[in-house]
Each structure stands twice: as C-alpha cells, then as structure tokens.
Amino acid sequence: RAALMMGGKTVDEIYWWKGKGFDTLAGRKTLPSVAALNAAIAAQIDKARPAYATPAQCVAHSAKIMHGDGKSVGDYAFQRPEGAASIYRASPDFDHSILGAATAVINEMDLGQGEATDVISVGLSATDYIGHAFGTEGLEMCIQMSELDRSLGEFFDVLDGEGIDYV
C-alpha cells in the first residue's frame, strides 16, 4: 500500500513486502540486489530468533499485562520460535529489511550519483504493526523505537558515506 501510494503509476522500481520477501509489479524483474536480499531473508525468516536485548530506557516499560485466553502484552522482546515467519512484520527486523532493500536499490541503480535528482520513498511499517499488535506503551514499542533509531542511523550513515543528499 505505501509503495503504491508513494510511487504512483510510473516508477522505475517499486517493491513491497509479500510473505517472505519483497515483490514488485507483475511483468517486472526484481533487481538482482533485491533478489539477493530476498534469498537472505528467506534463509533466516523461519529460524528461531533470540530476544532483543532490553535497552536501559526500556526497562521501566516492561510490564506483563494479561488479556484474553492467557495472552499478554508489555514484555515481549521479539524472540521468535522456529517456523514463526508470520510474526516477522510486527518486529524491528521488518523495518531493518525494508531499509536493506532501499540500500540495495540505491546502490544498484546508483541513485544520487548523477546530475538529475533521484527520489526514493521508503515506507517503514513495523511501528504500525507493533502498535496494533501490542499497544504503544510497553516493552515492544520501546524496543521498536530504539531499533528503528539504530537502523535509520545506519541507513543515513550509508547515504552520508556515499555523499548522497537527503531530506
């Protein structure tokens, strides 16, 4: 949805999440760098993942709150059991993958390296998925914000390192 809304009908490249990797419009080829990223994601997404370390600023937000059918929110650190790819989108790993795809497209297409202005629109959606799944005040959202900040910092470091201006 975000890709189509930001890109419109005439884009050079467009990608969105589809199950276990990034997909594009029917009849278009996926860039080799995005295909390689998809292969890397597919190799990891069904594997067990340990919990994220709890950042110091998030300790106070960790409070298990029980709700229907023995389920809880407020203390989940995004550990995933083997075979749990379906919960990938509602984790910091998702936004990290989106920024990885953006970096792959920038590098493969040499965006920001020519005379013409290049535009890349990146829609990060994990915060929305996490908010709907767990709420906005618990450990889950605090870890997401911390990891999103780290991932964006890494992304901007790449752009800065390549001399690419951005807004």
Name the predicted role of every residue range.
Residues 136-149:
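Active-site-proximal segments of metal-dependent phosphoesterases and phosphodiesterases across multiple
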Residues 146-167:
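Metal-dependent active-site segment of extracytoplasmic phospho-/sulfohydrolases and closely related
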Residues 123, 141-143, 166:
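Short, surface-exposed, charged/polar-biased interaction segments
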Residues 113-120, 163-167:
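Loop/turn elements at helix/coil->beta-strand transitions in domains of secreted/extracellular proteins
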Residues 110, 114, 118, 140-141, ...:
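Aromatic-residue detector
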Residues 103, 121-123, 153:
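Residue-level recognition of well-ordered secondary-structure positions
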Residues 1-116, 125-132:
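His/Asp/Glu-rich, glycine-adjacent segments
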